[in-house]
């Protein structure tokens, strides 16, 4: 499971020494695997305590960046706790789900997806 945390990356000072940047995905690092694709979506979502994003898959590279809370991420049968500052890469067609670690607290994420060149339109409301 590809999970990257700002806690594991040293910031690089950019913009004339005024802005620390934590590169969770280095420039062009995913060029080959996303080549020919397009930006499918950008969203923000919250899974309430006791909630669950049911297992599902998409023909996209999907990325979740945790902005608040903690959750249990499962991708293709591998389970890992994720928390604020983590970036999760979900490969195309990988079965995945997410739930908060407790029934009393939510997890809040920023999400974006890059579709593969041959991907059909996706109806996200069905998931």
Located regions from the model:
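Short, charged/polar surface micro-motifs in flexible loops or helix N-caps
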Residues: 39, 47-50, 70, 115-118
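A structure-centric signal for secondary-structure junctions around beta-strands
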Residues: 39-41, 60, 106-107
